[in-house]
Amino acid sequence: MSAVVSLDIGSSALAAVEINHSRDRVSLANAAIEALPEGLVVDGEVTQPEALAVHIQQLWRKAGLKGKRVRLGVANQRVFVRNVEMASIEDAEHRAAAVQFEAAEHIPIPPDSAIVDYQVTETFEDPSSGLRDRVVMVAAHREMVDALVSAVRRAGLTPESIDLEAFALLRSLLPPVPMIDAGSMDQPAQAICHVGASMTNVVIAVNRQCQFTRLFGFGGRQLTQAVVERTSMPVEEAEQVKRAIGLVGGIPNGWDENNTNAIRHALALGARPLVQEIGRSLDYYRSQAFARPIERVILSGGTSLCAGLDQYLAQALGAPVELANPVMQLDDANIDPQIAAHSAVAVGLALDGGDL
């Protein structure tokens, strides 16, 4: 049995998950979060590696995390994801070379400044050109990855792998595909909306294979700020009422109807851009020739703790919305709901490692 530690570095918090792998089970050994001050990570990019390293060390010490090798995820505006079609190539080395060539055509990063990875999502027969692959291509600015790695190494840890956060979300929030259905793209699509403090990641998959991913700059901080601007509450209090009162529900104990309605009105106004951008993402996916009907939307991320956000999105989007269960595939997964809400990426990283 070997311990694996995965670390999700967000704009407002660190989330670490340590799991145990044995022959027939995967169990949760430890999970913890550590709040971050503003400015260390901005829109998913590490801007102050030295200061961030101190908080990583604090998280390891407070939580009693034992592993020194970590798996990391990336998601920011300097990571580019493209869906391309190319001739199917069986040899892995030749395929990788072909992907590098395609990256030069599709990714707006100079080749010597980019780290490129890919995932084949479907192989199909084209009547005119034979076997072809649908490929999700990922490219990241090398200096952005270097800043992330630097912070982790300064904390005395060793990066084991770096993966796209979208892929990690698919592993933690969607059930494994039965062997009989592996490779089939005839199933309905599942959408994940991972709403963090400052960024939202929309991922759409069929049979756990990524077909679409989009990142945009909106998160829980904007909802909190909407309450601050319309009620003059301090930020800390606005953050609390955002979670406790939320967008939908009855009148909480200790609150009157007028104040509750004022807060919900502020949150509804603040949430409009979130609804619009998620809706645009879903509509764009639906417009693609390969799109499948979207069966449900799974809501994850720290902002999912905002009471009633799932119901609000379901009504606004006209689609079923479910709250995520990031630890559904782990045995003995007794975890605080506050920690669980922040752990979807970290759990997915722990379930498998990337190689960006």
Identify the residue ranges that each predicted region occupies.
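Glycine-rich phosphate-binding loop plus the immediately following alpha-helix
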Residues: 41-44, 145-171, 209-251
